[in-house]
Structures are given as structure tokens and as C-alpha cells.
């Protein structure tokens, strides 16, 4: 049950961040030389494949990919 809940969370995370875009549409603060909005997008470009990889690994362990 916990694995299924974690899979659902990993599936929903990239979509939830899209709903948060209006809240992060700011120039300040500057993070790593980028406006916060660009940093947010870059962060999720990196996090989204990690979520997909996590889902893949959990399903692979359960034999759900056969």
C-alpha cells in the first residue's frame, strides 16, 4: 500500500509543480545566476525524469513490467 501511495505521489509531483507556476513567477531571488522562475523550470526538468525513474524501479521490483 505504501508503494502504491509513493507511486501516485511521484506521478502527481510534476503536474502539481505546473499548478505552482503562477506562485513562482518572480525575478527575485536570483539562484545560481538565474531568475527564480528559470531556476524552478530547470529544477523540474531534472526532477521529472527522476520521478519517472523511481516509478520504473518500483514497478520493476514488483514485476509489473512483464
Curated annotation (Swiss-Prot):
InterPro entries: DUF3311. It comes from Bacillus subtilis (strain 168). Pfam families: DUF3311. Keywords: Cell membrane, Membrane, Transmembrane, Transmembrane helix. GO terms for cellular component: plasma membrane. The chain crosses the membrane at residues 5-25, 30-50. The keyword Transmembrane helix applies. The keyword Hydrolase does not apply. Its main location: membrane. It comes from the Bacteria. This is Uncharacterized membrane protein YoyD. It is a multi-pass membrane protein. It is found in: Cell membrane.
Amino acid at each position: 500500500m505504501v508503494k502504491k501511495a509513493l507511486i501516485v505521489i511521484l506521478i502527481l509531483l510534476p503536474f502539481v509543480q505546473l499548478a505552482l507556476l503562477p506562485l513562482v513567477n518572480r525575478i527575485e531571488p536570483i539562484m545560481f545566476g538565474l531568475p527564480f522562475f528559470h531556476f524552478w523550470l530547470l529544477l523540474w526538468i531534472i526532477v521529472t525524469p527522476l520521478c519517472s525513474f523511481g516509478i520504473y524501479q518500483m514497478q520493476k521490483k514488483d514485476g509489473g513490467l512483464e
